[in-house]
Regions:
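Short proline/glycine- and acidic-rich turn/helix-capping motifs at secondary-structure junctions
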Residues: 126, 218-228
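N- or domain-start disorder-to-order transition segments that initiate the globular core
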Residues: 1-26
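Short solvent-exposed loop/turn micro-motifs enriched in small/polar/acidic residues
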Residues: 1-2, 75, 224-227
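Short acidic-hydrophobic surface loop/beta-edge motif
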Residues: 6-11, 222-224, 231-236
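Charge-rich, well-structured scaffold segments of protease-associated domains
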Residues: 9, 59-62, 67-216, 232, ...
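Active/ligand-binding-proximal structured segments within catalytic/core domains
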Residues: 22-73, 245, 255-265
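Short, surface-exposed beta-strand/loop micro-motifs that present aromatic residues
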Residues: 17-20, 177, 229-234
Length: 265
């Protein structure tokens, strides 16, 4: 597919890629913050980032509820989602080319001006609890955090994560957003039909984004250790066996190494 890539680095710390695909009929948006579970204030509230992500498309400066925002966002078929990992929180959206600006404005609105409220907070705590409880029947979901812990990574298992949910308050959500959602911590990729005028509009929107300056958090690298013995999870109710092998590199891979690993995988 014919395309050109332009790197953007703005004075307010925002960085990203603009990918021009001249014949594209849709626009794709990805926004990422280093705001995952490892960046929460305490392990006792580990699921703060996950719950905040679930509240990402709720009430904000323009819409009073998630229902109102969702109805407006998707009225022409646009799609959005969000995800949280140990390190990152990502927001994505896809839309038809003709409404790219409206969807970009709505995405930035939800990211920059959420109005976290108690009603949506209680609802999403329950949704996150149900989601994680469902993973307890997935052998792979149980195995990999145990392997990570065995190699020295400071992560929690799904059982441990569920136990932290009751510790989290609405103020924890607001605090985590304030800490992590800054212009310096924002990275983006936008792909579609990006004319010169569209690029100028996009850059202007990021330059005027209603977020404070802050910190681009360092990628967390734990001190690795060699497990003394294999990790076993005994589940007497299971009729099959799931197993995995993990090789740990004790540093962050550079871009070329990541590309090579993706090809290898």
């Amino acid at each position: 597919m014919k395309h050109t890539v332009e790197e953007v680095r703005l004075k307010n710390g925002v960085q990203g890629l603009l990918i021009d695909v001249p014949d594209a009929a849709v626009m794709n948006f990805t926004f990422q913050f280093r705001a995952g579970s490892r960046y929460t204030r305490s392990r006792d509230i580990y699921e703060t980032a996950h719950i905040m992500e679930h509240m990402a498309f709720g009430a904000n400066a323009r819409f009073n509820s998630e229902h109102e925002f969702e109805a407006d966002f998707t009225k022409n078929g646009a799609y959005h989602n969000a995800s949280t990992s140990d390190m990152n929180m990502s927001y994505i959206a896809d839309c038809a080319d003709f409404e790219w600006e409206r969807i970009l404005d709505l995405q930035l609105l939800s990211i920059a001006t959420p109005k976290f409220n108690e009603k949506e907070f209680i609802a999403e705590k329950g949704n996150v609890r149900n989601e994680l409880t469902g993973y307890l029947n997935n052998n792979a979901r149980l195995l990999w955090p145990k392997l990570q812990q065995a190699f020295g990574e400071q992560v929690l298992t799904y059982e441990e994560r569920i136990k932290t949910i009751s510790n989290i308050t609405l103020n924890d959500i607001k605090e985590h957003h304030k800490k992590t959602h800054t212009t310096d911590n924002l990275r983006f990729v936008i792909a579609g039909k990006l004319t010169k005028s569209r690029k100028s509009k996009i850059i202007e929107k990021f330059e005027n984004l209603d977020l404070p300056r802050g910190e681009r958090f360092e990628f967390i690298v734990d001190d690795p250790k060699v497990p003394e013995k294999p990790v076993y999870i005994n589940r007497s109710d299971q009729k099959n066996i799931s197993f995995g092998f993990s090789v740990i590199i004790p540093r962050q891979l550079d871009d070329y190494e990541m590309d090579a690993m993706h090809a290898l995988n």
